[in-house]
Amino acid sequence: MTGKIIKGIAGFYYVYVEETKEAKETATGGTLYECKAKGTFRKQKIKPLVGDTVDIAVLDEEKHIGNVERILPRKNELIRPAVSNIDMALVIFASAKPDPNFNLLDRFLCMMEYQHVPVTICFNKKDLITPQKQQELKSIYEPAGYRVMFTSTKTGEGIDEIKHVLEGRTTTVAGPSGVGKSSIINCLQDDVQMETGHISEKIERGKHTTRHSEIIPIKDGTYIMDTPGFSSMDVPGFEKEDLWTCYPEFVEYEPYCRFQGCSHINEPDCGVKEALSEGKISQVRYDNYKLLYEELKNRQKY
């Protein structure tokens, strides 16, 4: 039997098995199995991750207890958060109240770029800003190649568009507190079958439990992962020299730099700074680049 690990805690792995075609007429959704991992994984120094697709052996069908027998090949593996098989990241910030922290947003974008995960940006609380402000926010991130969406959990605007973007994917959802992330997740769960509520109860999902990464089945083939905080840039191997490669809009202009290994800060004849002066790169993004570069530089000293 094959399923997906949706939560791992204290040596137990909770594996969600989607409903079978035969069971569709009577079942209310998939089934959750509480599993332990076989000792062979420990010997091979392999740790199952949230997001893994696994084969399980059922030990007790009535109590839904089993063993993880095999981990199927991973499409990708994120270091922070430690999860696998992610198709996309959805990062949620408020349009206002609180105003978006662009430095924090750019940190997250860099982390995902470094780990090769496509990102969609969602600005919630659309009802609090003008169309002009929406355009301002778009102008910072759309030139960098990011999809920018606006939602309002108050009016319901944009929620269907988000559902469409998430469909058929496993998406990690992140965002600081106070931006309406939980409200959006609740809206996305409107269509979730009854069994998922039971699953949430079984794995003790609560309002303040995002200390652990956890996958929420939305419907068969569509999953979202509620992700803990992301302010740290502590990804092994991530150095200041890598930072510019995590700014997609810099990559286009880097070949025009006079010096190889240009940091795009102090060097003359820099293609990136030239693009900045021509308004092709956002000043907000560039200012954050300099701050993050300095932070990584200082970290390397120690």
Curated annotation (Swiss-Prot):
Subunit: Monomer. Associates with 30S ribosomal subunit, binds 16S rRNA.
Stretches of the chain forming a coiled coil according to its record: none
Segments forming domain CP-type G: 75-233
InterPro entries xref list: G_CP_dom, NA-bd_OB-fold, P-loop_NTPase, Ribosome_biogen_GTPase_RsgA, RsgA_GTPase_dom, RsgA_N
Free-text function comment from the UniProt entry: One of several proteins that assist in the late maturation steps of the functional core of the 30S ribosomal subunit. Helps release RbfA from mature subunits. May play a role in the assembly of ribosomal proteins into the subunit. Circularly permuted GTPase that catalyzes slow GTP hydrolysis, GTPase activity is stimulated by the 30S ribosomal subunit.
One GO cellular component term: cytoplasm
GO biological process terms, semicolon-separated: ribosomal small subunit biogenesis
Compartments reported by the entry: Cytoplasm
Family statement: Belongs to the TRAFAC class YlqF/YawG GTPase family. RsgA subfamily.
Residues that, per the record, bind Zn(2+): 257, 262, 264, 270
GO MF, one example: GTP binding
Keyword list, A-Z: Cytoplasm, GTP-binding, Hydrolase, Metal-binding, Nucleotide-binding, Ribosome biogenesis, RNA-binding, rRNA-binding, Zinc
Residues binding GTP, per UniProt: 124-127, 175-183
Name listed for the protein in its UniProt record: Small ribosomal subunit biogenesis GTPase RsgA
The protein's Enzyme Commission number: 3.6.1.-
NCBIfam families linked to this entry: ribosome small subunit-dependent GTPase A
Entry cofactors: Zn(2+)
Lineage: superkingdom: Bacteria
